[in-house]
């Protein structure tokens, strides 16, 4: 059984993934950071229930947004602070879907310092610039 980890009032609760809900994992590629973004180049959406992946190019972003609007749960990496705000800024996208942001999950489970320590201890061959949190600074 797959589980969904949710933080409510700083406490974690495990709940089963519901077969009755539509879970969409998505990512987008754009032309810049939030302050300077002017265009979304593409959006890829994976429907967990149907196990189908959909790719939307620059001429089909409206279709991708309509697809995202069908979700009960949206999942992605840094979607709270980047992807969803970019879609709102450029296309007036809003959602009432539950959000699972894997960047937030990662930081809750492994604080930056702990990630660095784990990388150093378990993977000493990993170059220092690739250790630690998944941030621009890391890369």
Walk through the language-model features, giving the residues of each.
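Conserved Rossmann-like nucleotide-cofactor binding loop
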Residues: 31
């Amino acid at each position: 059984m797959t589980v969904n980890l949710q933080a409510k009032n700083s406490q974690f609760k495990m709940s089963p993934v519901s077969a009755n809900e539509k879970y969409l994992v998505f990512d987008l590629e754009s032309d810049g950071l939030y302050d300077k973004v002017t265009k979304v180049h593409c959006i890829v959406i994976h429907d967990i229930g149907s196990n189908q992946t959909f790719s939307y190019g620059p001429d089909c972003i409206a279709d991708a947004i309509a697809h995202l609007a069908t979700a009960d749960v949206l999942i992605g990496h840094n979607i709270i602070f980047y992807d969803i705000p970019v879609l709102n800024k450029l296309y007036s996208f809003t959602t009432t879907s539950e959000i699972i942001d894997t960047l937030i999950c990662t930081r809750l489970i492994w604080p930056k310092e702990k990630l660095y320590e784990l990388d150093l201890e378990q993977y000493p061959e990993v170059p220092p610039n690739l250790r630690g949190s998944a941030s621009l600074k890391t890369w």
